[in-house]
Amino acid sequence: MKSILNDFLLMIQFFTRIPINKNLQCEKVNFRRGAFFLPVVASIIGGMEFLIYLGLKNFLPPNVIIVLLLLFTAMITGGLHMDGLADTCDGFFSLRDKERIIEIMKDSRMGAFGTIAMIINLLLKYQLLYSLVLKDCSIAIILAPVIGRISILFLCLSKRTAKKNGSGNIFIGNMSKPIIFLITIIALAMNTYFLELKITIISFTAVLIITYLFYLLCLNKINGLTGDTLGACNELGEITFLLILLMM
């Protein structure tokens, strides 16, 4: 029980800015087991956002609330996944060789492509969430972060790392397939509880397709995956899910 709590708190500490004033074991096995809690952490973040939405919806217009939710997400996650998207776009769109792309992705300075990608990402999320709220589908606020993290886990089934060292190497190729599939079943069951089965199947299939296509792009560009590409995959997964949800 103690090890389970350790791994759960480790995921909160690693993926959020929620203060965990506790010394935790952080070996590779802890991250491997802790991956089970990644969608749980996402649902906690989404749940907090949903509570903010419920608390403000009678006082502020939906568009203002969505902006505040995006700000809250950036603060609670430290912009971790959006930063990965920006770095990935800076590198991939530079049209350089693998080594130079990875150097660009490691650069803390944001380039033009990263800036454009982040702006488009935020605009898309804003418009999609706003439109879904108007359609009385505010539950998407909770579901989208969960699906995004599921896409990360599927990407981590690959053992192809683009760098010898990096934070992403903790997860890439070190995930348990049975755990990932169990998490997926639980996430799909949760989705089906709130959405029609048809919508769940179509949206999740679309996310898997986008995840696989992105994986092929990563192989083509840098012959593997990095922590930045995992973050980018999360953002792509969330956007894809929200798009399909709005279309349905």
From Swiss-Prot:
Question: What keywords are annotated for this sequence in UniProt?
Answer: Cell membrane, Cobalamin biosynthesis, Magnesium, Membrane, Transferase, Transmembrane, Transmembrane helix
E.C. number: 2.7.8.26
Q: Which GO terms describe its molecular function?
A: adenosylcobinamide-GDP ribazoletransferase activity; cobalamin 5'-phosphate synthase activity
Reactions the enzyme catalyzes: alpha-ribazole + adenosylcob(III)inamide-GDP = adenosylcob(III)alamin + GMP + H(+); alpha-ribazole 5'-phosphate + adenosylcob(III)inamide-GDP = adenosylcob(III)alamin 5'-phosphate + GMP + H(+)
**Key word Membrane present:** yes
State the Gene Ontology BP annotations. cobalamin biosynthetic process
Subcellular localization, per the record? Cell membrane
Q: Cross-referenced Pfam families, in alphabetical order?
A: CobS
The record lists the membrane-crossing segments as 36-56, 59-79, 113-133, 137-157, 170-190, 199-219
> What are its cofactors?
Mg(2+)
Q: Annotated pathway, please?
A: Cofactor biosynthesis; adenosylcobalamin biosynthesis; adenosylcobalamin from cob(II)yrinate a,c-diamide: step 7/7
**Where is this chain primarily localised?**
membrane
Q: Quote the cellular component terms of the Gene Ontology held in the record.
A: plasma membrane
Question: What's the protein's topology in the membrane?
Answer: Multi-pass membrane protein
Q: What does this protein do?
A: Joins adenosylcobinamide-GDP and alpha-ribazole to generate adenosylcobalamin (Ado-cobalamin). Also synthesizes adenosylcobalamin 5'-phosphate from adenosylcobinamide-GDP and alpha-ribazole 5'-phosphate.
Q: Which family does it belong to?
A: Belongs to the CobS family.
Which HAMAP family does the record associate with it? CobS
| Designated name of the protein | Adenosylcobinamide-GDP ribazoletransferase
Q: Which organism is it from?
A: Clostridium botulinum (strain 657 / Type Ba4)
Q: Where is the organism placed in the taxonomic lineage, from the top?
A: Bacteria, Bacillati, Bacillota, Clostridia, Eubacteriales
